[in-house]
From Swiss-Prot:
Family designation: Belongs to the universal ribosomal protein uL24 family.
GO biological process: translation
Descriptive protein name: Large ribosomal subunit protein uL24
GO cellular component, one term: ribonucleoprotein complex
Subunit structure: Part of the 50S ribosomal subunit.
Listed NCBIfam families: rplX_bact
GO MF term list: rRNA binding; structural constituent of ribosome
Function statement: One of two assembly initiator proteins, it binds directly to the 5'-end of the 23S rRNA, where it nucleates assembly of the 50S subunit.
Keyword annotations from UniProtKB, A to Z: Ribonucleoprotein, Ribosomal protein, RNA-binding, rRNA-binding
Length: 79
């Protein structure tokens, strides 16, 4: 896959077209990625030990990898 975690990408299609962000996670099996600050969705969560109040939580949803283009690769300091 051409996108790796930590790369800076720009959305080229969809409702968030033009937005930029860093890749948080990659699912190579479904060709979907999660980009920070892009494709925000609201999820209703029940109260639990980690989230005592529960309620509506806003988080990033996944988008298809074909809808983004890489602006800058993550710098690898091990080279």
């Amino acid at each position: 896959m051409f996108v790796k975690t930590g790369d800076k990408v720009k959305v080229i299609a969809g409702k968030d077209k033009g937005k930029e962000g860093t890749v948080l996670s990659v699912n190579a099996k479904t060709n979907r990625i999660v980009v920070k600050g892009v494709n925000k969705i609201k999820k209703h969560e029940k109260p639990s030990q980690t989230n005592a109040n529960g309620g509506v939580v806003e988080k990033e949803g996944s988008i298809h990898a074909s809808n983004v283009k890489v602006i800058a690769k993550k710098e690898d300091n091990n080279k």
